[in-house]
Structures are given as structure tokens and as C-alpha cells.
A protein has these predicted regions:
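A short beta-loop-alpha structural element at the N-terminal edge
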Residues: 5-20
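Conserved beta-strand in the GNAT
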Residues: 59, 66-77
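Conserved acyl-donor/pantetheine-binding loop and adjacent beta-alpha core of acyl/acetyltransferases
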Residues: 72-106
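Conserved acetyl-CoA-binding loop-helix of GNAT-fold acetyltransferases
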Residues: 103-120, 138-142
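Conserved GNAT acetyl-CoA-binding A-motif
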Residues: 121-132
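Conserved catalytic-core motifs of GNAT/GCN5-like acyltransferases
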Residues: 128, 146-160
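Conserved active-site alpha-helix within GNAT-family acetyltransferase domains
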Residues: 132-149
Length: 170
């Protein structure tokens, strides 16, 4: 990981760079056995604008002031998490969800950085990923998440669901 990565809210003028990052991420996923998680146009322009307008979209900036990654951190209920199959959530406490995390592949440790950022604000973090996304599944588990079960996306696709509960400070 670079020495001085910075996280800031995404601005509308960042969208062209985000589209490049998502294209790179889709190629990476396909080359690593996960060609189906993100459609060629995912996320849509409308989704990107909604994430920005809701204040949920963030970018990671490198020392050279380049956007190297992006993620969504949404606080509050995610409707797709209301029903979980083959398991259960660790608790019913308020949570934030990490979605659409992607990088340009040039900087390591982006997932850990996004999680640390999220944990500065929230004690409960949920995330989900496609069964075939082995790279993300490994990153999730290596960073202390617990596997909780299966959720269904708005389109009916299954996702593996995880939760991280921050330990209280003693």
C-alpha cells in the first residue's frame, strides 16, 4: 500500500475515472473466474450519480493525486439483507454496508483501507459478494468478517453475505 492514501467523497467529475476503474475490475474478475458478478454496464450512470448524491460514494487518492480505487459505504438498512438464508446475521444492530469496491490494480490493501475507514464511523459492517469472487471472499475473511449466509440481490442473484462486528474498546 502506498504511504499516503487519502479517502474523500466522490465528485461528479470523478465519474469518467470511476468507469475506467470499474472496467479494470470487471476484467480482473473475469480473468479470475468471476465473469458474471458485474454486467458490462455495471454500475450504471444512474447508480453512480445516486451513490454520489446520497453521499455514499468514496474514492481513494494516491500520493500522485490519482484516483486508484472507489467504494460505496452506505449506512442504514439494505433491503437485500432483510432476509438471509442458510444462516443468520451476527446481530440486528444498526450497520453500514460496503458495496462496489474496485481498484485500478496498482495499489494493494484497498479493501483493508476501506474497512478501516468504515470502522471509524460504524461498529457493524456488512458486505456480500458472488460465490465465484474468490479474491474478494478471501479478502473479506482475511480481514475478520464472519460468513453469515446467502442473500438475494434485487434481481434474484445469490450472494454470500458477511458481517464484521467491531470489538468494544477496553
Amino acid at each position: 500500500m502506498e504511504e499516503n492514501l487519502e479517502i474523500r467523497k466522490t465528485r461528479k467529475e470523478d465519474i469518467p475515472q470511476l468507469k475506467q476503474i470499474f472496467a479494470t475490475a470487471r476484467q480482473f474478475m473475469a480473468s479470475n473466474g468471476n465473469p458474471d458478478q458485474w454486467a458490462p454496464t455495471y454500475p450504471s450512470d444512474e447508480q453512480l450519480h445516486n451513490d454520489i448524491n446520497n453521499g455514499d460514494s468514496f474514492v481513494v487518492i494516491s500520493d500522485s493525486r490519482q484516483i486508484v480505487a472507489t467504494f460505496v459505504l452506505h449506512a442504514g438498512i439494505d433491503p437485500t439483507y432483510n432476509t438471509i438464508y442458510e444462516g443468520q446475521w451476527l446481530n440486528d444492530a444498526p450497520y453500514a454496508t460496503i458495496h462496489r469496491i474496485a481498484s485500478n490494480g496498482q495499489v494493494k490493501g484497498i479493501f483493508r483501507l476501506a474497512l478501516q475507514f468504515a470502522l471509524n464511523c460504524y461498529d457493524n459492517i456488512r458486505i456480500d459478494t458472488h460465490h465465484d469472487n474468490i479474491v474478494m471472499r478471501n479478502a473479506i475473511m482475511q480481514n475478520g468478517f464472519s460468513y453469515c449466509g446467502i442473500i438475494h440481490c434485487w434481481n434474484g442473484d445469490e450472494r454470500m453475505a458477511y458481517q464484521y462486528v467491531k470489538e468494544p474498546d477496553v
